[in-house]
């Protein structure tokens, strides 16, 4: 009997609740301290296994692991690629998502509008945002206005002192606009893309600085940071929905040519500019924490399903359909 398992963090509550709604047994695994969160306060886990990745026990319980950002961050891409436990999704996608140069190639292949990338900090001629590689919830991001500003902040925030240390960061043009994070689900079984929900992030300290009068901001000499602390639901202007949907379709098509396909949940992270252009910064090729806003469904999933449908439940339903049709091996790697 297949059970659905995930690392006890990030979006595990939503994933396991969705799995229960679809009739699956559930497993959370992770640090002992959080056991009661998943078994008592929010009783969504039938089993709680201690450890970052208790592989033998997961195999014994016939688990299918659902990846999250926390899971990838804790184990690392190399270990996840070697997992013996069935993994929902295409593991090949991981290296394309975690390496910003490969990610850029993917998004360019999808013909999305992207910000300029600066290979040399000395070429900075406008505001840029500097991003370390990997899924870290915005930690280590910073804004720089010039080459001099870049080097000062790179040493302060990331310990970078020379160009030889730049291989693990990306210097990206800062595009002004409204941040949006559309959440998608692509079904390998039906070949259909679904827009599940949309959010924007609440980040520390950038979203709190506006509460401080400008004069005091200058006196405090604050450094802006972008660590994600929460999420805010967003319903997009209806005339912009096709821009978002078409971007998702192109990303899936490009993935089929580059890495054998992307299926399951993913998110494009970008902004709508004042000219109503959707500029994409990066992709999260897995469930994102912004979907936690919609455990009982979103305005978009209600239009399609007429029942509560979270991204976590949609994952479980895909696995359920795959089992019923004898296609489970097609949706796990």
Curated annotation (Swiss-Prot):
GO MF annotations in UniProt: ATP binding; ligase activity, forming carbon-nitrogen bonds; magnesium ion binding
Keyword tags: ATP-binding, Ligase, Magnesium, Manganese, Metal-binding, Nucleotide-binding, Purine biosynthesis
Function: Catalyzes the ATP- and formate-dependent formylation of 5-aminoimidazole-4-carboxamide-1-beta-d-ribofuranosyl 5'-monophosphate (AICAR) to 5-formaminoimidazole-4-carboxamide-1-beta-d-ribofuranosyl 5'-monophosphate (FAICAR) in the absence of folates.
Cofactor(s) needed by this chain: Mg(2+); Mn(2+)
Binding site for 5-amino-1-(5-phospho-beta-D-ribosyl)imidazole-4-carboxamide: 10, 70, 231
UniProt xrefs under Pfam families: DUF1246, DUF1297
Signal peptide (residue range): none
Enzyme class: ligase
UniProt-listed GO biological process terms: 'de novo' IMP biosynthetic process
Alphabetical list of InterPro entries matching this protein: ATP-grasp, ATP_grasp_subdomain_1, IMP_biosynth_PurP, IMP_biosynth_PurP_C, IMP_biosynth_PurP_N, PreATP-grasp_dom_sf
Top-rank taxon: Archaea
Binding-site residues, Mg(2+): 269, 282
Co-factor binding comment: Binds 1 Mg(2+) or Mn(2+) ion per subunit.
Pathway: Purine metabolism; IMP biosynthesis via de novo pathway; 5-formamido-1-(5-phospho-D-ribosyl)imidazole-4-carboxamide from 5-amino-1-(5-phospho-D-ribosyl)imidazole-4-carboxamide (formate route): step 1/1
Name listed for the protein in its UniProt record: 5-formaminoimidazole-4-carboxamide-1-(beta)-D-ribofuranosyl 5'-monophosphate synthetase
């Amino acid at each position: 009997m297949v059970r659905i398992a995930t690392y006890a963090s990030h979006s595990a509550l939503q994933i396991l609740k969705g799995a229960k709604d679809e009739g699956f047994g559930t497993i959370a695994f992770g640090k002992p301290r959080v056991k009661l969160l998943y078994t008592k306060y929010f009783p969504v886990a039938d089993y709680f296994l201690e450890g970052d990745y208790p592989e033998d026990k997961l195999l014994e319980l016939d688990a299918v692991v659902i990846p999250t950002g926390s899971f990838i961050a804790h184990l690392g891409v190399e270990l996840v690629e070697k997992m013996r436990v069935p993994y929902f999704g295409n593991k090949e996608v991981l290296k394309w998502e975690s390496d910003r140069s490969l990610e850029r190639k993917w998004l360019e292949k999808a013909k999305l509008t992207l910000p300029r990338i600066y290979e040399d900090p000395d070429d900075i001629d406008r505001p840029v945002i500097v991003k370390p590689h990997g899924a870290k919830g915005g930690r280590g991001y910073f804004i720089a206005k010039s080459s001099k500003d870049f080097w000062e902040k790179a040493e302060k925030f990331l310990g970078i002192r020379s160009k030889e240390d730049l291989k693990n960061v990306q210097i990206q043009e800062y595009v002004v606009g409204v941040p949006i994070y559309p959440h998608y689900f692509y079904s390998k079984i039906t070949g259909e893309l679904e827009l599940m929900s949309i959010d924007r992030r609440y980040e520390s300290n950038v979203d709190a600085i506006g509460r401080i009068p400008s004069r005091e901001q200058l006196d405090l000499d604050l450094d802006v940071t972008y660590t994600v602390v929460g999420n805010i639901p967003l319903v997009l202007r209806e005339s912009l929905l096709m821009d978002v949907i078409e971007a998702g379709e192109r990303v899936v098509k490009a993935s089929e040519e580059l890495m054998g396909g992307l299926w399951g949940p993913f998110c494009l992270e970008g902004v709508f500019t004042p000219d109503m252009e959707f500029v994409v910064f990066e992709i999260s090729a897995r469930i994102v924490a912004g979907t936690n806003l919609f455990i009982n469904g979103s305005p978009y999933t209600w239009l399609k399903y007429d029942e509560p449908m979270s991204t976590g439940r949609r994952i479980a339903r895909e696995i359920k359909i795959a089992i019923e049709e004898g296609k489970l091996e097609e949706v796990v790697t």
